[in-house]
């Protein structure tokens, strides 16, 4: 009996060696399709029969399009598992996959630190009016015309976090380094250990008390 087949959907940027190492236990295959129509036809032709697992990157959407009900129905009957390499899985219809008996995984904690870094950068930029100054600089006006306002220090400001998941908790730690106090609202109140001492408030109180409001949750 040969090795099970693992399908790569999309280019790998940082873990090619790890993917290649899977060849010890699986036959690694890559579709020849260049777009969704070709990929569906490739699936229907039987060329991908025997694939039991697929690893998809965000870039795979240019080949497969969304992993929706139409695509799921065309996937090989042998496919039992899809590994998605991001936290958000809005490109994958998990209900359609479940109906086909296909399990789907994601990596919810991987981007927490990097996302919170960018979040903090945007908060500082909003407080200090970075965008106005950058536009003036690119226009060749060192001080701006008229000069932009000085903006606000983060120290002493109240950061309201809506959605205290991994990103929200990570952001809380970074904001406190800049002297901000943190309040939050979540679907449920977190334990003292999970919240790191941040104050849990109602949604209305969050809007009332926050100097800066950070949304860290699915917008739908």
What are these regions (language model features)?
Residues 1-62, 179-181:
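N-terminal glycine-/charge-rich "phosphate-binding" loop or analogous flexible N-terminal tail
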Residues 3, 79, 155-158:
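Phosphate-coordination loops involved in phosphoryl transfer and adenosine-cofactor binding
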Residues 22, 44-47, 71, 75, ...:
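Structural alpha-helical scaffold elements that stabilize or flank donor/cofactor-binding regions
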Residues 31-38, 61-64, 139-146, 193-200:
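Short gly/ser/thr-rich secondary-structure transition/capping motifs
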Residues 50-138:
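Phosphate/diphosphate ligand-binding glycine-rich loop within oxidoreductases
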Residues 130, 147-220:
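Rossmann-like dinucleotide/phosphate-binding beta-alpha-beta segment
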């Amino acid at each position: 009996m040969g090795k099970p087949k693992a399908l790569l959907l999309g280019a790998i940027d940082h873990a090619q060696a790890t993917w290649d190492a899977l060849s010890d236990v699986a036959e690694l295959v890559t579709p020849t399709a260049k777009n969704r129509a070709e990929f569906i036809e490739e699936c229907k032709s039987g060329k991908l029969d025997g694939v039991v697992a697929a690893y998809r990157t965000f870039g795979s959407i240019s080949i497969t399009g969304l992993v929706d009900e139409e695509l799921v129905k065309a996937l090989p009957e042998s496919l039992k598992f899809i590994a998605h390499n991001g936290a958000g899985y809005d490109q994958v219809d998990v209900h359609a996959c479940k109906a086909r008996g296909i399990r789907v995984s994601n990596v919810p904690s991987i981007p927490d630190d990097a996302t919170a870094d960018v979040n903090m950068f945007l908060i500082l930029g909003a407080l200090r009016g970075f965008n106005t100054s950058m536009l003036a600089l690119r226009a060749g006006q060192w001080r701006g015309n008229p000069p932009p306002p000085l903006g606000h220090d983060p120290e002493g400001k109240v950061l309201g976090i809506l959605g205290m998941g991994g990103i929200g908790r990570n952001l809380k730690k970074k904001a406190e380094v800049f002297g901000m106090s943190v309040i939050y609202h979540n679907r449920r109140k977190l334990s003292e250990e999970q919240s790191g001492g941040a104050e849990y408030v109602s949604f209305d109180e969050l809007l009332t008390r926050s100097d800066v409001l950070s949304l860290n949750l699915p917008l739908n």
